[in-house]
């Protein structure tokens, strides 16, 4: 919960300005601007952040203020805001907490001698990029726009798709130092009221200094999971059409300022696996894509542990599948081969992420080919193991959720170790543990991963 300043604007102009000058580091911070001018023969002081304000808009507003005479000057701030400010977004603020928050978030606030309130003009122009297509959630047939780091742009992208008065977007904030804006979006006639109240209550009670990692910080603060539970509690998307579709299904979408993605809940593992592209094709094609992605995702968990189990018990393998047996000499136990390859694949992935864009693709290809070819020839790995690990590495990208991919990877590693140590019993126990992770893994809505009920 954010501790707010309870002091309010008084009738003394000098005391108000003195408090602002003491609170804001005007003398030390070059980007905090303090501008004095006369309006209708009375003193006024403007406060704003350099770089956030539209200079052209402020120039026109100040020019209009200079033409105000003493006879035309209204007696109170409320009347002044209605009659003398030629701008759209204007507020009258009486609490210093609201005033300071508005100044530090980029709006222009000014005091006029004789008024017991401050006037706020939202002339902000945040540095922002275009609403280009996300690099991760690419579309085959749908819209090509994506969320950006400015929260008001993101709400506009969803409002453009849902022109319904039942679409509510409530603004709140979290973080004592960061005061990060958070938008809770929902359809008032479709949302689960109990879930909505739970979410808003948790956000209001947050006691954090900042949301330095944006939505991930908010997710961890809203739902503190056990350290050994790798499964994500929220679905993230950078596509406005996906977020809008989830709103129409009765779900809650949370937007965080400075984050180019949306949090969606409640969610299940099938929600994590599905993509927006499934709905841009005919029903049969979309169903095929969903089923294929689900089966391949399941295969990434059980494929290599099952192969290891059969290699430890070759008598169980039917004759028709005898070609999958390892034919070359095994210099390194299969379990160590699998574990080393898991680590090597992560190494290649991290190297590709930290390599300059123009070099990442060729270097990844060269490294993969060279390491794969020479590691087999040198006897470190068997070619069959390399083939099956290559399938698992590629298949892991068939589902769009990065965090879910690592959760499934940890389940696969657990199965590999248990199978190598305890053979069939270890594999069975590992399968039971994976199922328990899914069944007993509760989300913020109180449902488990296998509960696909919407509302």
Please give the residue ranges for each predicted region.
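Short polybasic/polar patches that bind polyanions
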Residues: 163, 204, 349, 376, ...
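Hydrophobic alpha-helical transmembrane segments of membrane transport and translocation systems
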Residues: 383-455
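Transmembrane alpha-helical segments that form the functional core of multipass membrane systems
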Residues: 253-254, 261, 267-400, 404-413
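Membrane-embedded alpha-helical signal segments
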Residues: 1-306, 310, 314-316, 323, ...
């Amino acid at each position: 919960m954010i501790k707010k300043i309870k002091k309010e604007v008084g009738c003394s102009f000098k005391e108000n300005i003195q408090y602002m000058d003491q609170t804001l580091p005007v003398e030390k911070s070059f980007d905090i601007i303090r501008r004095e001018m006369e309006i209708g023969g009375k003193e006024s002081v403007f406060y704003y952040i350099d770089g956030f304000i539209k200079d052209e808009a402020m120039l026109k507003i100040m020019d209009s203020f200079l033409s105000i005479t003493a006879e035309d000057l209204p007696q109170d701030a409320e009347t002044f805001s209605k009659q003398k400010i030629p701008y759209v977004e204007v507020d009258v603020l009486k609490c210093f907490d609201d005033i300071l928050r508005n100044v530090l978030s980029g709006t222009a606030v000014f005091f006029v001698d004789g008024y017991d309130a401050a006037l706020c003009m939202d002339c902000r122009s945040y540095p922002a990029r275009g609403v280009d297509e996300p690099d991760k959630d690419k579309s085959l047939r749908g819209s090509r726009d994506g969320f950006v780091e400015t929260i008001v742009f993101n709400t506009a992208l969803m409002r453009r798709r849902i022109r319904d008065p039942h679409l509510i977007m409530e603004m709140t904030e979290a973080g004592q130092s960061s005061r990060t804006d958070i938008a809770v979006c929902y359809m008032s006639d479709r949302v689960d009221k109990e879930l909505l109240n739970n979410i808003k209550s948790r956000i209001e009670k947050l006691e954090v200094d900042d949301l330095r990692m944006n939505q991930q910080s908010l997710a961890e603060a809203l739902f503190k999971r056990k350290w050994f539970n790798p499964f994500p509690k929220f679905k993230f998307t950078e596509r406005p059409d996906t977020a809008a579709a989830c709103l129409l299904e009765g779900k809650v979408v949370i937007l965080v300022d400075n984050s180019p993605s949306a949090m969606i809940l409640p969610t299940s593992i099938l929600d994590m696996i599905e993509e927006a592209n499934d709905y841009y094709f005919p029903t049969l094609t979309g169903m095929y894509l969903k089923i294929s992605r689900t089966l391949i995702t399941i295969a990434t968990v059980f494929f290599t542990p099952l192969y290891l189990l059969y290699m430890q018990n070759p008598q169980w393998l039917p004759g028709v599948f005898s070609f999958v047996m390892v034919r070359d000499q095994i210099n390194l136990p299969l379990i160590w081969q699998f574990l080393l390859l898991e680590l090597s694949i992560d190494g290649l992935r991290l190297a590709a992420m930290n390599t300059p864009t123009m070099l990442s693709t060729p270097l990844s290809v060269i490294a993969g080919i060279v390491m794969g070819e020479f590691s087999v020839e040198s006897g470190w790995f068997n070619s069959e193991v390399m083939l099956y690990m290559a399938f698992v590495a590629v298949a892991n990208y068939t589902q769009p959720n990065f965090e879910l991919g690592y959760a499934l990877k940890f389940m696969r590693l657990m199965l590999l170790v248990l199978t190598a140590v305890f053979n069939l019993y270890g594999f069975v126990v590992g399968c039971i543990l994976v199922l328990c992770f899914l069944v007993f893994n509760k989300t913020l809505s109180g449902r488990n991963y296998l509960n696909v009920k919407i509302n």
